Design a protein with these regions (language model features):
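Conserved beta-strand hairpin/beta-sheet module of binuclear metal-dependent hydrolase folds
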Residues: 5-54, 135-145
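Basic, glycine/lysine-rich polyanion-binding surfaces/domains
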Residues: 1-3
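Hydrophobic/aromatic beta-strand patches that form the interior of the parallel beta-sheet core
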Residues: 16, 69, 92, 123-125
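Metallo-beta-lactamase
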Residues: 95-135
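Active-site metal-binding motif and surrounding structural segment of the metallo-beta-lactamase
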Residues: 50-93
Length: 145
């Protein structure tokens, strides 16, 4: 497990992850936040973790948070606090997330033209009736030396 608040590079300079504990019905689970640097340099934050000072310092060191993505109705808990820390970021997600947590204030849904254009290197994938995610569609990671 990656230490909470520490972003581990999955693909150097492009993709990072951090894991954090969450409690669900008395069971301790791990959740993962993924950060992608888009081709224009903006950061895309998928399923945000709690925006602690350490997390925000790590994100700020990577670049400007432009997109906060609530991927489905289950991964909404830290979106309001993250949006408050990054008020210029767009919050994207399904209406079901906002219905489940009224504090989630969506800027737009993932099918709106502005979001589709800005994140064209990402392709949405449907994982089930209630779950969806994104994958890189036109990304070629640099080859290791």
């Amino acid at each position: 497990m990656v230490a909470p608040g520490v972003f581990e590079a999955v693909v150097p300079d492009f993709i990072w992850v951090t894991e954090h504990p969450i409690w669900f019905s008395g069971v301790r689970l791990r959740a993962r936040t993924t950060v992608v640097r888009l081709s224009g340099g903006a950061l895309w934050v998928h399923s945000p973790c709690a925006p602690t000072d350490d997390v925000c310092a790590a994100l700020d060191a990577l670049g400007e948070v432009r997109w906060i993505v609530v991927p489905n109705r289950f991964h909404h808990l830290q979106a309001p606090a993250t949006a408050a820390r990054y008020p210029n970021a767009m919050v994207v997600g399904p209406k079901s997330a906002q219905a489940r947590n009224p504090r989630v204030s969506l800027t737009m849904s993932a099918d709106e033209p502005e979001y589709v254009r800005a994140t064209s290197e990402l392709t949405p994938i449907q994982l089930g009736v209630f779950l969806s995610s994104m994958r890189l569609s036109s990304f070629t990671p640099p080859l290791a030396p």
